[in-house]
Amino acid sequence: MTASLWQQCLTRLQEELPSGEFGLWIRPLQAEFGDRSLTLYAANRFILDWVRDKYLLRINSLFTEICGADAPTLHFAVGRRPTAATVQMNTAAAPVADVRIGPAITVPSWTSKQDAMPEINHKSNINETYTFENFVEGKSNQLALAAAHQVAENPGGAYNPLFLYGGTGLGKTHLLHAVGNGIRARKPNAKVIYMQSERFVQDMVKALQNNAIQEFQRYYRSVDALLIDDIQFFAKKERSQEEFFHTFNALLEGNQQIILTSDRYPKEIDGVEDRLKSRFGWGLTIAIEPPELETRVAILMRKAEENKIHLPHEVAFFIAKRLRSNVRELEGALNRVIANARFTGKPINIDFVREALRDMLALQEKLVTIENIQKTVAEYYKIKVADLLSKRRSRSVARPRQLAMALAKELTNHSLPEIGDAFGGRDHTTVLHACRKIAELREESNDIKEDYSNLIRTLSS
């Protein structure tokens, strides 16, 4: 058995999987070869279980395809193997817009000795109600959740820094607190600080005013994990950026975990120095997208359960179908429904919800129309709306038309026949085919996935 077998498998998997997925799960695996066997080693149990559940059948089929009857038996284990027995991929996956993979650091800060110094009292600000257990997973946040789990299990060693970006109310803050709670559950004395970026600025200003900048630096550079929300507010604050630049470097050199969030991709943050934006992408950068319909329903059902309220599934579906922009909006709507139900004593049904949320629903329906979707898609692809309505079948027109149909089904309450009629009198089966095709392409093509997400953000903002 030679290393070339696993290299061939890696090459095939890299071709088949999205770059971010390959880099997060497959590339870090290490292979040990035995007598007619191959053992794949994962860094921790979470990664091992994920890889075994998602990729076992495909890896075995590749072994059979390459080796035939001589295919090795595949085993999994947690840990690392000696260098001589280990093979990793030495070709890097191409970066994509929503996930970036960079170098990882392997030693948690609290396993290495620190210089002796007086104890500093760190106020964590971690919200104990935000945990991994009550975070609702969906396709839109799956990678971010997986990376957050790994960071909580191995702070300073899994992905450092971890940079999460996406629109308001999509769960970035929840994940920050969940990581903080996860770290402290494993290491109760860990110094974990959560903060908004504005607090870092305010603390620095106070330190300068009080001639206490060294104490400020010591405070922030002696943490085990620093979790900063909304890093985009550092924009145009040169002195704060300078201080954070040195804090960032000190933490990274000390193998101390950094997690940052923003409403946009690092390189798109205006007013932040290039050297900082470059460092933001050194570890792992992941986008969190607006939740899909099934996840929105699951969020509502979970929230209702937490409030000990019976929410009929059809009511959750009714709300989720109409409110699509973010989790915060969904939870706010449900809170209003619950408050109205408790005040009036009426049962929660669709008519009750329609009345309780009439202003929110009216606004949402006014904002997103099929006509608006058609104009937005046409502008995005630099074609004419008339092209979307025409009989033209060239890929440059057909694909945007399918995307627009899928968006109309996702973002409006129109039936398939109504959507088809709005696209040049097409049959409802054409719309159904378009929706299924786009769903497939979002799984297979990073370009289509990114286009769809960009259009959703534009139409929902």
Curated annotation (Swiss-Prot):
Stretches the record annotates as Domain IV, binds dsDNA: 342-461
Residue span of region Domain II: 83-124
Protein origin, superkingdom: Bacteria
Residues engaged in binding ATP: G169, G171, K172, T173
Subcellular location: Cytoplasm
MF annotations from Gene Ontology: ATP binding; ATP hydrolysis activity; DNA replication origin binding; lipid binding
Key words of the record: ATP-binding, Cytoplasm, DNA replication, DNA-binding, Lipid-binding, Nucleotide-binding
Residue span of region Domain III, AAA+ region: 125-341
A cellular component term, taken from the record's GO annotations: cytoplasm
SMART domains: AAA (SM00382), Bac_DnaA_C (SM00760)
Region (Domain I, interacts with DnaA modulators): 1-83
Signal peptide location: none
PROSITE patterns for this protein: DNAA
Entry note about domains: Domain I is involved in oligomerization and binding regulators, domain II is flexibile and of varying length in different bacteria, domain III forms the AAA+ region, while domain IV binds dsDNA.
Subunit description: Oligomerizes as a right-handed, spiral filament on DNA at oriC.
Function description: Plays an essential role in the initiation and regulation of chromosomal replication. ATP-DnaA binds to the origin of replication (oriC) to initiate formation of the DNA replication initiation complex once per cell cycle. Binds the DnaA box (a 9 base pair repeat at the origin) and separates the double-stranded (ds)DNA. Forms a right-handed helical filament on oriC DNA; dsDNA binds to the exterior of the filament while single-stranded (ss)DNA is stabiized in the filament's interior.
Family: Belongs to the DnaA family.
Protein name: Chromosomal replication initiator protein DnaA
